[in-house]
Amino acid sequence: MKKIVILLTFCLATVYINAQEINWVTLEEAVALQKKNPKKIMMDVYTKWCGPCKRLDRDTFQNKDVANYVNQHYYAVKFNGEGNDEISFKERKFSNPGYNPAKANSRNSAHELTRFYGIRSYPTIVFLDENLEFLAPIRGYKNPQQLELYLKLFKKNDHKQLTTQEAFNDYYETFKPEFKITSNK
């Protein structure tokens, strides 16, 4: 019995040590933080019904390397693309006038901010620069190493030199991921 308790304690300690959380904030909080310490913003646009969004949360955003890198170099925003939050951003108010509370956990109307960025699929990760200017949408599920490419691309401003699809393809082919893929299942 003692061995089982020790083994269980060790397993739980290992899970706790390996667990890392991204410090999620609202878009408005990120804008306020920008004024004190400018960083790029990584905004996860998700929905409650989206399976790949849940997988992104579980497998990628819970990854220790991803969480550490994001927390160090970005403000991370979680935004429900079909939610009913009212957002003040870029001297505008964004809401979801078509929101139906009865459909809160299923497909709902798109939020105005979602439409503002032209997001039509979930998950989509939107990157904004330190001046809150739109950099790019990254659509679909990405594992930690796939997301690493974009995190480092925008952090290092390498995207500014990639003016053609061929240049991006070369960057993609030569990129050497460093993040470890771990299972959180």
Regions found by a protein language model. Name each.
Residues 20, 35, 118, 129, ...:
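Non-globular targeting/processing and membrane-anchoring segments
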Residues 21-24, 63-105:
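Thiol-based oxidoreductase modules, predominantly thioredoxin-like and allied folds used
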Residues 48, 81-82, 131, 143:
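Solvent-exposed coil/turn segments that connect beta secondary-structure elements
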